[in-house]
Amino acid sequence: MSDLDTSGLNIRGLDVENARDVVRRALDEDLGGPDGVDVTSSATIALTDMRTAEVVARAPGVVAGLALFALVWDDVARRLASPRLQVEALVADGARVASGEVLARASGPTQVLLVGERTALNLVCRLSGVATHTRQWADALEGTGAQVLDTRKTTPNLRALEKYAVRCGGGTNKRMGLYDVAMVKDNHKLAAGSVRAAFDAVRSRYPTIEVQVEVTTVAEALEAVAAGSRFLLCDNMSAPLLGETVRAVRGATTDRVEIEGTGGLTLARVREYAATGVDYLSVGALTHSSPILDLALDLV
C-alpha cells in the first residue's frame, strides 16, 4: 500500500498543475462555482461525521489516474475548511485489476467523501477506460515491433490526462498539440502547392521543429523523404500498400525514417498492418471512443 498523493501523478510525467486545474474546474461545474455547495450533503451530514470509503472496480480493466481522488478530495476539503482525507492506494496506475478489487481506501469527513465522489469517479473512470482500451491494442501488437500511438482526438481540456492514461495502458503519445510538432496534412499540401513546398515552408519558418508529413501514396512518401522529412504518416492505406510504401522508403535512404500507419484500423487486423514493418499505428479511438471502466465508491 502507498499514500495516494500528488506525487503519484509524476510517475509517468503528468503535469500536476494541469490536473489540479482540471479538478478545480470540474468541481466548480458540479458545485455551481468556487463558493458553491452540495445542498444535499451539507443539509444531511455534519462536518464532524467521519467515515471510510473504498474505491472498487466493477469490471476488469487497467487503472489510470487514481491520484485524482486525492486531488479532488483535497480541493473539496479546502472549500469546506475541513480536515483532509487520509487516502491509500492499493494498486498502481497501469495495473490490471479484477472486478470487485478494492483500488483505494479513504478515511475522513463524510461530507468531503461524498461531495467529491462523482467528480473523482467521472475523471478516473474516464482515464481508466482509456488505459483499458489502450492496453487491448498494446497487447494485440506485442512482439510485432510496432507501437500504438494516440492522436489529438481528445476531450477538450482533458488532453494531458487522457494522454497520461494512454501511457498507463502501454501506448505511446504523439504530439501534444499544434505547437510541438509540425504535421503537414492534405490541406497544407493543397494550400502550399506540393509536399515539398509545404515541407520547405515549415522548415524555413521553424528550423528546429520536427516536420512530419501525411502521405497517401508511395510517390508522396518518397517526395517527403527527398524533401527531408524523417517521419511519415501513411493515411488510409491498405496493408499491401502500406507494406509497399515501407519497402520503398527503406530502400530510398539509409537515414532513419519513422513510419506511422493510420485510418480504419481494427484490433482484428492490427497485426496484419504491423507486419508491414511500420514503427507505429495510430488509433484515434483510444481517446475518442473508449468506454469508461466502471468504478464505484462504497462507504464501509
Please report, for each region that a protein language model flagged, where it lies by residue:
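Acidic/glycine-rich phosphate/pyrophosphate-binding loops and surrounding catalytic core
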Residues: 2-227, 243-248, 258-260, 271-280, ...
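Conserved structured catalytic cores and adjacent interaction surfaces
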Residues: 220, 224-241, 265
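Glycine-rich beta-strand-to-loop/alpha-helix junction loops that act as flexible
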Residues: 234-235, 259-265, 283-285
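Conserved phosphotransfer cores of two-component systems
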Residues: 253
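Residue-level signal for the nucleotide or nucleotide-sugar donor/cofactor binding architecture
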Residues: 268
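Active-site loop ensemble at the mouth of alpha/beta enzyme cores that anchors a bound cofactor
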Residues: 296-300
